[in-house]
């Protein structure tokens, strides 16, 4: 079709070389490796982020060699229960977008409804615009985004904030990426009530709830970072603790695990402090024992 096989081959070869070079240049692999190392589990999320990164990279490359670019939508939706790594992954996503030159600064600004919506007439627009100003050049992460929309209250100022966000999403695509986050079911309802907004959110990532064994691994990783470890017995007790905690109200996955660890460290310190011998070994200082966890009120009920 006008192109000789040799010419086509040459172009193909040329493009292939560019892809590899471009990929190396962006240092995206480092971000993906960090993501892999820092977060336990989350396989589907990690795969999805890799897919999005690949799409964005290929699109950049197509632009470079003069091919049509589909102009990929950059706004995203991260759904899942609290403490499942949405904010952590959003930080990495911001870095990827920055490295691919889609945004100029690459920082993450995390907000909730209260940061965007005022309580009185005339307060919402300046509040939302102030947040947008801070987030320009980076990623705006709106946690529990569905609280922006209150269908029962016609005069709620949340819709004013949504209007402003919509304008920015459409007109300043070069400067700002928005990630809407929250529970899946509530987000689905939010999108259904705001089709204009939904149509501008191109990438959806769903964060699954962690299994107890994954939460134990997360705990062990967090402890290791702080140079602590669990005894074998403490491991089993902690797993038991997690299973009990999951059934309690306000359970927030890895965040609840982090809080539990903080409390276990407190009890550990107390135990060490009360030891009859005031000479302690390094192992005393680093080892969390079963009793440090068993003293949690969860085991007294
Ligand atoms: N898979 C994981 N491996 C290791 N640490 C994790 C993992 N998931 C979450 N964490 C840690 O748990 C804490 C909470 O995670 P993060 O804030 O990213 O969750 P979130 O889904 O954004 O929660 P929320 O929506 O409630 O703000 C962070 O300290 C994070 O490092």
UniProtKB/Swiss-Prot annotation:
ATP binds at residues 80-87. Keywords: ATP-binding, Chloroplast, Nucleotide-binding, Plastid. It is found in: Plastid, Chloroplast. Gene3D superfamilies: 1.10.8.60, P-loop containing nucleotide triphosphate hydrolases. One of its GO terms (molecular function) is ATP binding. GO terms for cellular component: chloroplast. It comes from the Eukaryota. Belongs to the CbxX/CfxQ family. This is Protein CfxQ homolog. It comes from Cyanidium caldarium (Red alga). The lineage of its organism: Eukaryota, Rhodophyta, Bangiophyceae, Cyanidiales, Cyanidiaceae.
């Amino acid at each position: 079709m006008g192109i000789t096989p040799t010419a086509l081959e040459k172009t193909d070869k040329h493009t292939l070389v560019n892809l590899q070079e471009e990929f190396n240049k962006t240092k995206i692999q480092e971000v993906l490796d960090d993501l892999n190392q820092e977060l336990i589990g989350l396989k589907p999320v990690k795969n999805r982020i890799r897919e999005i990164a690949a799409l964005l990279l290929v699109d950049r490359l197509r632009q470079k060699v003069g091919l049509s670019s589909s102009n990929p939508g950059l706004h995203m939706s991260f759904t899942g229960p609290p403490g499942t790594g949405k904010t952590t992954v959003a930080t990495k996503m911001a870095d990827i977008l920055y490295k691919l030159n889609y945004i100029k600064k690459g920082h993450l600004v995390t907000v909730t409804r209260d940061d965007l919506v005022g309580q009185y007439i005339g307060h919402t627009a300046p509040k939302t615009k102030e947040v947008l100003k801070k987030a320009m050049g980076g990623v705006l992460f709106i946690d529990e985004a569905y609280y922006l929309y209150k269908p029962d209250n016609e005069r709620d100022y949340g819709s004013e904030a949504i209007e402003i966000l919509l304008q920015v999403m459409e007109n300043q695509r070069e400067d700002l990426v928005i990630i809407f986050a929250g529970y899946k079911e509530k987000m689905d309802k939010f999108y259904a009530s705001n089709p204009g907004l939904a149509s501008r959110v191109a990438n959806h990532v769903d964060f699954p709830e962690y299994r107890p064994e994954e939460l134990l691994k997360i705990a062990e990783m967090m402890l290791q970072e702080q140079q602590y470890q669990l005894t074998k017995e403490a491991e089993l007790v902690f797993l038991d603790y997690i299973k009990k905690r999951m059934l309690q109200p306000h359970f927030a996955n890895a965040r609840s695990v982090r809080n539990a660890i903080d409390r276990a460290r407190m009890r550990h310190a107390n135990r060490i402090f009360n030891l009859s011998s005031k000479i302690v070994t390094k192992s005393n200082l680093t080892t969390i024992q079963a009793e440090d966890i068993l003293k949690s009120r969860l085991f007294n009920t």
